[in-house]
Amino acid sequence: MLHHYYSGGAGHHQDVAAAGSPGDMASSTFSLFFPMSNGQCWPPSTVEESAAYDDHSTVTTSPSSPSSSSTGSVDCTLSLGTPSSRRAEPVAAAAPAANHGAPVPAHYPSLSAATVSWDATAESYYCGQQGRPATGAAKCAAGAGHDALLDRRCANCGTASTPLWRNGPRGPKSLCNACGIRYKKEERRAAATTTTADGAAGCGFITAQRGRGSTAAKAAPAVTTCGEETSPYVVGGGGGGGEVADAAYLAWRLNVVPPAATATAFSVWPERASLYHYN
């Protein structure tokens, strides 16, 4: 409380704070700036009144009624609660009066009941806001036309991320980029091996085609293997001792330089008859 003292000689007033405890002074000062509607001081004197304001996670705003004073009671505490917890505050404030003055802690609803599951929200969003909760990703994909590319995996390595899908043994776009390249290489290698095997098997047919150009080769027996092929340029079969027909042409065909007919004793290398293969 503030007392006014008058000094007759000076002619002015002096306001001196009455001596009291620090707690009373703090409560009086706070009550001056934040008056309550019922005229009481801010720190409640009873347990019931303190329980009514013991809420540090909500904001309470009480509008002034016509019967009360013109100033309203506003609690400017930091709001850390949810709208559901704010709605539960009047129930928690009225609980002490119903229990004969005993303070009852405020019971807030559980988090699972107050909030919505993010998975359910996401599924309902991707399902096109259908109004009914989604029961699973499979039903969501079936109902909203889920893209099959999101569930596609490589048939070889099982990866789901690749810059390009390639054709494979299980159908189009069944392999990832790396596995598709390896599969193509193996396929080409197998095709080349098959072609080589077919050429080796047809060696007897090639020999028969060559034999058509020589009369002596027609009389020779047909040979089916490459190792026993009879040369069509040897007269009398390939048994040895036969006369070689067209030896110059045979040497040119085999890329071999024929030796000179008459070699001298002083020559180390065989002499060429001319610069050309044909004499």
Curated annotation (Swiss-Prot):
Disulfide bonds: none annotated. Disruption phenotype: Reduced plant size. Delayed transition from vegetative to reproductive growth. Reduced panicle size with overgrown bracts at their bases. GO terms for molecular function: sequence-specific DNA binding; zinc ion binding. Residues 58-74 have a biased composition (Low complexity). SUPFAM superfamilies: Glucocorticoid receptor-like (DNA-binding domain). GO terms for biological process: floral organ development; regulation of DNA-templated transcription; regulation of timing of transition from vegetative to reproductive phase. Highly expressed in inflorescences. Expressed in vascular bundles of root stele within the elongation zones, of elongating upper internodes and of the junctions of leaf blades and sheaths. Probable transcription factor that regulates organogenesis during transition from the vegetative to the reproductive phase. Regulates the expression of CYP78A11/PLA1, HD3A and MADS1 during reproductive development in rice. May act upstream of CYP78A11/PLA1 during panicle development. Acts independently of the photoperiodic and gibberellin signaling pathways. Belongs to the type IV zinc-finger family. Class B subfamily. This is GATA transcription factor 15. It comes from Oryza sativa subsp. japonica (Rice).
